[in-house]
Regions:
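Repetitive, compositionally biased segments used for assembly/scaffolding
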Residues: 20-178
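Hydrophobic h-region of N-terminal signal peptides that target proteins for export
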Residues: 10-18
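A periodicity- and composition-biased signal for non-globular, repetitive helical segments
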Residues: 8-9, 48
Length: 178
């Protein structure tokens, strides 16, 4: 899915940083009073690269529609959580074709661990997230060989708006999934 799923599927974006600190993009998310959210994604130069719009149904399943900078739909993601608190997200392209998924669980310390697979079920990478006492979340991404390829850091302000910064160990590598 576009470069390690474009390098890894993590579709709640934030500003990321990697070992070498190349800023490769950011996103800002706004959530309305109905709980629906809209994210605007930008590249390292601040140019808009696309948007994501999410809503959650009465069953607690979240559907996200991804659009490019011209507003064209390029894919969707559907997230569900089981009775054990494990989360599965399935990704589809603009034609509805299955292109991969992610599976997450949260440990007893509140850290989230995620594995990613492509459309054929092959393992493509993983990520690990933790949230500090200030509510800031840091995520580290690794490829299918366990090599760290980047990271992201997210902060939610008092209005509930979330900003994420992304950094990669390669200036040409994106961690975004879309």
């Amino acid at each position: 899915m576009k470069k390690l799923m474009m390098t890894l599927m993590a579709v709640t974006f934030a500003i990321a940083a990697n070992a070498q600190g190349y800023n490769v993009g950011s996103s800002s998310r706004y959530t309305d009073s109905f709980g629906n959210s809209t994210s605007t994604h930008r590249n390292a130069n601040g140019g808009i690269t696309g948007t994501s719009s999410s809503y959650t149904d009465s069953f607690g399943n979240t559907t996200t529609t991804h659009r490019d900078r011209n507003g064209r739909v390029i894919g969707t993601s559907t997230t569900s959580t089981d009775c054990f608190g494990n989360t599965t997200t399935r990704h589809q392209n603009a034609n509805g074709g299955y292109i991969g998924s992610s599976n997450s669980y949260t440990d007893s310390f509140g850290n989230t661990h995620t594995t990613y697979s492509n459309g054929n079920g092959g393992f493509t990478g993983s990520s690990n997230s933790y949230t500090d006492s200030f509510g800031n979340t840091t995520t580290t991404y690794s490829n299918n060989n366990g090599q760290i390829i980047g990271s992201s850091s997210s902060h939610t302000d008092s209005f509930g708006n979330t900003t994420t910064e992304q950094r990669s160990n390669n200036t040409n590598t994106s961690i975004w999934s879309w």
